[in-house]
Amino acid sequence: VGSEMCIRDSLYFYPKDMTSGCTAQACNLRDNYSELRKAGYEVIGVSVDNEKSHQKFIEKNNLPFPLIADTDKKLVEQFGVWGEKSMYGRKYMGTFRTTFIINEEGVIERIITPKEVKTKDHAAQIL
């Protein structure tokens, strides 16, 4: 109290709206949003889904933070989180679930990698 709050962006990249893991992650961040804000974090989600999909995802899950529709894949490529994935033996291009903590000067302070992200407890990882 009385000191200036340092705002950090928690820019989290996720594969797809309405999927189980992405919904669990978004809802965990939603449920802990006030605690994240008190600690000086702004939460911003990014996926390659379009704005209409994001709006449905926000409304269905009552998300209090913005989602960026990176339909041209500029952000996922710039942050290095777009690449070949595989599921059930099928290879495809997709987003690696990754979170970047960016300070007020725009410098990446910390990266929570795809192997580290816990979708159901992600807010605690950020804090």
Task: Annotate the PLM regions.
Residues S10-L11, V43:
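Hydrophobic beta-strand anchors of alpha/beta hydrolase catalytic cores
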